[in-house]
A protein has these predicted regions:
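Helical "substrate-binding/catalytic lid" subdomain
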Residues: 28-150
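Long, positively charged, glycine-interspersed low-complexity recognition regions
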Residues: 158-160
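Intrinsic-disorder-associated, low-complexity terminal segments enriched in Asp/Asn/His/Tyr and depleted
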Residues: 166-167, 171
Length: 171
């Protein structure tokens, strides 16, 4: 983000470094990065839940991923992180600690604009749990491990899941 005239003057130089898109006034580039990270965090959660659902229902999660990856739900997240999850490969590409930092920044930015982002808030809480449990250096697809641990607990005020989401501790 920044002044449109300056952007136009420097666009060719910027193109030498990668894809260039003008997104608006100063600060808009940072918001675009946060928007990207919100999609990444939430989508890793969605991929995790989809694979857990497939497995719980008796379907082959690898086959389910293969079946849907070229459809409407297909995405780089399903391709890359779905594969990591299925291979149980949580060596860091993007660390849980970094995803948590981004989720905190997303929530702080939303608060500054007086908006509520419920999915981002829940994902932030889940990453807080992961980091508090000492798994901050794992790849952010390790969100799957926590969601899988929580899969048998319905979300109500007496459930373990509810307690975890509000007290941030689990065993």
């Amino acid at each position: 983000g920044g002044d449109k005239k300056i952007f136009e003057k420097t666009k060719n130089l910027l193109k030498s470094m990668g894809t260039v898109t003008y997104v608006g006034k100063t600060g808009s580039g940072q918001v675009a990065k946060l928007a990207n990270q919100a999609i990444v965090g939430i989508t890793i959660g969605a991929v995790s839940e989809a694979l857990i659902l497939a497995e719980a229902a008796g379907a082959d999660p690898k086959a389910v991923r293969k079946a849907i990856k070229n459809g409407f739900a297909g995405s780089p997240i399903l391709e890359i992180h779905g594969k990591r999850i299925l291979e149980k490969n949580f060596e860091p590409g993007g660390k849980c600690s970094t995803q948590l930092k981004d989720m905190k920044n997303i929530i702080e930015t939303a608060k500054a604009y007086k908006i509520h982002l419920p999915l981002s808030e829940k994902i932030k809480k889940l990453y807080e749990i992961i980091v508090e449990e000492g798994k901050s250096s794992l790849d952010h697809s390790a969100l799957y491990l926590l969601i899988k641990k929580l899969k048998k607990h319905p979300l109500n005020k007496t459930s373990k899941t509810w307690l975890i989401m509000h007290n941030r501790s689990f065993n």
